[in-house]
A protein has these predicted regions:
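Rossmann-like NAD(P) dinucleotide-binding subdomain of oxidoreductase/dehydrogenase enzymes
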Residues: 6-12, 16-151, 204, 274
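Thr-Gly-centered strand-to-loop micro-motif
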Residues: 53, 59-60, 110-111, 143, ...
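Structural signal for hydrophobic packing residues in well-ordered secondary-structure cores
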Residues: 7-15, 76, 80, 103, ...
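Gly/Ser/Thr-rich beta-alpha loop segments that engage phosphate groups in nucleotides
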Residues: 30-33, 56, 64, 93, ...
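Conserved C-terminal structural/oligomerization subdomain of aldehyde/semialdehyde dehydrogenase
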Residues: 81, 105, 142, 196, ...
């Protein structure tokens, strides 16, 4: 539904370009590189605003999810889109590198890991290309003592185990107010015991498989290398076919521990506690990332006080993963820059017009009816 919403929203915005962005024009050719975790949604985020502003697109999907993009290209053909407007190029990282360095590309829009994003920024430096980066995250999930704990637990299931934690804005760093920490952890462990694990295509399950053995190995090695804190693993046998990693909770970590600082990109939740709201803000901002954050509290004044202090691109209150095509999404720090969606996203696919619309001709003042001495002595509200 959100992918569809992006096309619907941007189709409407395309009709308003002349009236709302009269001094803007299309950038030109936009090179776009998307990841494998949301192949259709990421495609919609990239292509819809680019086409709405009159650009052409060269898009490279991830190696594992090329078929989604190729099917979309066929839909474009059936819809009558002119050849050359949307171009899908499949391949590995070498193909993406060719797109990034091609001299005829006017803009690069990339969603993926921070490491690759850093290399893309280096490659485009000095080239004059426009650049949008939406990178990794280590998003804090803050639970205050006055929060509805049952709702916060359910929200956390969606925040970290949706799509097996393979989400850039996953709430993977749990910060719990000390007065309710024991109760919250108990409720969370009870909920973890009831998580349904199985076929990702089955809509009734909570957690599916990781994308491939490489990702499974990475998650496993990061967790096994950690010796701090207390680990709780969802009980039960994992399905044999597929890269299923059990949902894992690790509590009692130090803010400087590797698992509290680095993006795991899997179904692993790490946690620590805080005593005061100011400490919660300090812990939340104690990372090189800044993509998203979630705050759970029944006190609206507390929420409105905490949210602006969080160094993230988006803050959700008493909810998570709440997105809309009309709202710009993006990060700060090493989570990237630029926005996708909303007016901010549209502006990223435009440039100022070099030739403005001509002004209407104004007739010269003949002097008739003016002051006799030629001096205007009327009162002015300066």
């Amino acid at each position: 539904p959100l992918a569809q919403r992006h096309f619907y929203y941007h189709a409407g915005m395309a009709q308003l370009m002349d009236s709302e962005l009269p001094d803007a024009q299309a950038l030109g050719v936009c090179g776009q590189i998307i990841p494998w975790n949301f192949p259709l949604l990421m495609l919609a985020w990239k292509i819809a605003p680019a086409l709405a502003m009159g650009n052409t697109v060269v898009l490279k999907p991830a190696e594992y999810t090329s078929l989604t993009a190729l099917l979309f290209a066929d839909i474009c053909r059936q819809a009558g889109l002119p050849k050359g407007v949307v171009n899908i190029v499949t391949g590995d990282g070498a193909v993406g590198e060719m797109i990034v360095t091609h001299e005829d590309i006017d803009k690069i829009a990339f969603t993926g890991s921070t490491a690759v994003g850093r290399r893309i920024r280096e490659a485009t430096a000095g080239s004059g290309k426009a650049l949008t980066l939406e990178l990794g995250g280590k998003s804090p999930y803050i639970v205050f003592d006055d929060a509805d704990l049952d709702s916060a637990v359910e929200g956390l299931v969606d925040a970290i185990w949706f799509n097996q934690g393979q989400v850039c804005c996953a709430g993977s760093r749990l910060l719990v107010h000390e007065p309710v920490a024991d109760r919250f952890y108990a409720k969370l462990r009870t909920r973890m015991e009831k998580l349904r694990i199985g076929d990702p295509l089955d809509k009734s399950i909570d957690v599916g498989a990781l994308v491939d053995p490489v990702q499974y190995k990475r998650v496993s090695e990061m967790v096994e290398a950690n010796t701090a804190g207390e680990r709780f693993v969802t009980p039960g046998q994992m399905p044999e076919n597929g890269c299923f990693y059990p949902p894992t909770l690790i509590t009692g970590l130090n803010p400087a521990d590797t698992l509290m600082q680095e993006e795991i990109f899997g179904p692993v939740l790490v946690s620590t506690t805080f005593r005061t709201p100011s400490e919660a803000v300090q812990l939340a901002n104690n990372t090189r990332y800044g993509l998203a954050a979630t705050v759970w509290t029944e006190n609206v004044n507390l929420a409105l006080d905490i949210a602006p202090q969080l160094e993230t691109g988006i803050v959700w209150v008493n909810g998570t993963n709440m997105m809309d095509a009309a709202a710009g999404f993006g990060g700060k720090r090493e989570s990237g820059f630029g926005r996708e969606g909303g007016w901010e996203g549209l502006a990223g696919y435009t440039k100022p017009k070099t030739a403005q619309k001509p002004l209407k001709e104004i007739e010269a003042f003949s002097g008739e009816g003016g002051p006799e001495d030629g001096i205007d002595r009327t009162a002015k509200l300066y």
